[in-house]
Amino acid sequence: MKKQIISLGALAVASSLFTWDNKADAIVTKDYSKESRVNEKSKKGATVSDYYYWKIIDSLEAQFTGAIDLLENYKYGDPIYKEAKDRLMTRVLGEDQYLLKKKIDEYELYKKWYKSSNKNTNMLTFHKYNLYNLTMNEYNDIFNSLKDAVYQFNKEVKEIEHKNVDLKQFDKDGEDKATKEVYDLVSEIDTLVVTYYADKDYGEHAKELRAKLDLILGDTDNPHKITNERIKKEMIDDLNSIIDDFFMETKQNRPNSITKYDPTKHNFKEKSENKPNFDKLVEETKKAVKEADESWKNKTVKKYEETVTKSPVVKEEKKVEEPQLPKVGNQQEVKTTAGKAEETTQPVAQPLVKIPQETIYGETVKGPEYPTMENKTLQGEIVQGPDFLTMEQNRPSLSDNYTQPTTPNPILEGLEGSSSKLEIKPQGTESTLKGIQGESSDIEVKPQATETTEASQYGPRPQFNKTPKYVKYRDAGTGIREYNDGTFGYEARPRFNKPSETNAYNVTTNQDGTVSYGARPTQNKPSETNAYNVTTHANGQVSYGARPTQNKPSKTNAYNVTTHANGQVSYGARPTQKKPSKTNAYNVTTHANGQVSYGARPTYKKPSETNAYNVTTHANGQVSYGARPTQKKPSETNAYNVTTHADGTATYGPRVTK
């Protein structure tokens, strides 16, 4: 039985209809279905057989996943790659929407068939239904389309890197050298964090510094790689920027040099004997900061000015005991009262680009009428999952923006004859999309409550030297975010509803698409032949025997080859076909049982013959060698009375007496 297809591409709006039921309305900003490269003639070919069905699906899934991995690659986060990435994204979305539309059309036919057949079983929901009528030609077109898109993307990347020397990829030694240079600066930040982490005045600033550092470097398990000169320079600028911010916010001076934190010397939690070294490091750092002058302010990455800002007042206080990961989309309000406003003067970086405050427009498209999703919500209600923190598609450069733009409530105007109002209300950790089939509805998107810190006297975080970036739209079904610069961010990939599967090499593909590796096979296992006569040998190689005969009796054919009931084959002597033994002209005898024996080579009844070189070929084929001819030289007797005659023979006379 074929399994279910969830969205193969799992991207943007296309994937939402694979995973949401008929009550969900999707916000569509662009129709990508025309971007598909599937030929019209391919739709009328033969469908994929049951035997190859999931091999085909796995192959397509691998194609989509490979393309998405390229789009998410950290080194392609620079804006110079945007056009190439957009072209690849467009192709992926086009093929994904083609599969979506095909499934929608097929499901409509299935509903009509179900209603007319009076089945006693429950009708399958849309996300449980299988896309059966996929032709082999359609698969080939989609596969080749994605393959070509990836090829063109890699080709454009090479051209871009050829024109921009600072984007040329480092070799192994170059990458190691650049990484060391960056992490030397990281060690200085670690020193500041451990020095002021428990400080009553600067502890919160130290924790914030650590959160910014984690954002620049990436996940601990998958840190950003420093693969070219531009990434190295931007990362160093970002690190220097957050160090400058720390000293500016704490109203201290940055020393010219800071002792680098070394875990092998200063980590006293792992080794208690390192406690004196740690205390010495803290003392040296505080002393260096105290003795530093203000000359460092002339060397900062960005310019700081005195400005009057409104102090953000957080609704709810919550002390942070441990370093927290930076939150995306923290909701803060500027509290103003009649006749009073809390104002303070703080040094902040001035924004270089004005944050857009206009209304965001989109298209509200009514979702198709499908049955409700199982194991999700009650009829007519879909619950959005928690807003997980994710690594975005582009590098989260700290030079982008630290400010949280206060955007007005966007109004999404529909194109279906009625408008849908988007009302933003604060609530818990989930948002609910409500709608009634057959009716247009108002959508209430209630943002999640986020963690807050203690109320601070500091104003908004300073902007850096790049265009501010904020979330323009977030798809509720997939968690995919679209930013104001046209880029996308992704959350965890959707499950494909497949059970975990472990192959012959002990590699397990889990339900969420991740892969885990077990111990490698010991290779010391004996050869094993399964019911299909396929033998797996001890070295992992596979050999194929004859296909089993499915309980048929043993059968021997005209060539004395016997196929047994278990599918094995044995070979008997070649049949003699009742012919007598036969000896050919070369004295080779083929006997009645098929064996062959070789006699002496025939002499052809020729007499012995001696050639000019005194080599004699006898009648039985043997050869004997005489003395080499003397070439008509006269007989010659040497001092020992041995005579060599003209024909090469030698005669011996009596020995010479002295």
Curated annotation (Swiss-Prot):
Sequence repeats lie at residues 492-518, 519-545, 546-572, 573-599, 600-626, 627-653. Residues 391-406, 428-440, 499-514, 521-531, 636-646 have a biased composition (Polar residues). The keyword Transit peptide does not apply. Transmembrane segments: none annotated. It comes from the Bacteria. Residues 1-26 form the signal peptide. Keywords: Prothrombin activator, Repeat, Signal. Residues 391-531, 619-658 are annotated as: Disordered. InterPro entries: Staphylcoagulase_N_1, Staphylcoagulase_N_2, Staphylcoagulase_rpt, Staphylocoagulase_N. Belongs to the staphylocoagulase family. The C-terminal tandem repeats are not required for the procoagulant activity. Staphylocoagulase is an extracellular protein which specifically forms a complex with human prothrombin. This complex named staphylothrombin can clot fibrinogen without any proteolytic cleavage of prothrombin. This is Staphylocoagulase.
